């Protein structure tokens, strides 16, 4: 299979570079091969990038499935790693109604006891300001 390019110019125009050597201007196959190399490289890079993204997504989805799986009570007592991490245990889930279940007191440096602030639950004042509750005056029945 041979490949050749045939360039013809209209009669009233002149071509700028005049070929003076004895060899002809038949460089068609090498020109076609050189023009195809960048597109082949770009295609290979896109395929490699796609494979990397698919591999990362599979690996991250497998790790999140393991983390989000509910923890059985028997697993808490049998596995020391789970027992050391109380965030995974079902006893430390958020209370849906927002009421506090227990008060934890922390002894400060000065010796007085203060209730420990729960870092996972926003303060009551912040919950009131989320809506329009801050517009309603606080009425105390005491």
From Swiss-Prot:
Disulfide bonds: none
Tissues expressing this chain: Specifically expressed in brain.
Stretches that traverse the bilayer: 34-54
InterPro entries: Opalin
Record topological domains on the Cytoplasmic side: 55-142
Residues of this chain annotated as glycosylated in UniProt: 6, 12, 14
Keywords from the named record: Cell membrane, Cytoplasm, Glycoprotein, Membrane, Transmembrane, Transmembrane helix
Signal peptide range: none
Stretch list, region Required for plasma membrane localization: 78-94
Sequence ranges on the Extracellular membrane side: 1-33
GO terms classed as biological process: regulation of oligodendrocyte differentiation
GO CC annotation: cytoplasm; plasma membrane
Cited PANTHER family: OPALIN (PTHR21102:SF0)
Protein function: Central nervous system-specific myelin protein that increase myelin genes expression during oligodendrocyte differentiation. Promotes oligodendrocyte terminal differentiation.
Protein's UniProt name: Opalin
Source organism of this protein record: Sus scrofa
Organism phylogeny: Eukaryota, Metazoa, Chordata, Craniata, Vertebrata
């Amino acid at each position: 299979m041979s490949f050749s390019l045939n360039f013809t110019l209209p009669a009233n125009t002149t071509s700028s570079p005049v070929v003076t050597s004895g060899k002809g201007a038949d460089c068609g196959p090498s020109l076609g091969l050189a023009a195809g190399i960048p597109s082949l490289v770009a295609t290979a890079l896109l395929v490699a990038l796609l494979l990397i993204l698919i591999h990362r997504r599979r690996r991250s989805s497998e790790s999140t499935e393991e983390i989000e799986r509910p923890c059985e009570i028997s697993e808490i007592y049998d596995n020391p790693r789970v027992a050391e991490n109380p965030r995974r245990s079902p006893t430390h889930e958020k209370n849906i109604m927002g009421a506090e279940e227990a008060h934890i007191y922390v002894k400060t440096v000065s010796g007085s006891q203060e209730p420990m602030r729960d870092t996972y639950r926003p303060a009551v004042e912040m919950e009131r300001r989320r809506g329009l509750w801050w517009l309603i005056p606080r009425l105390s029945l005491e």
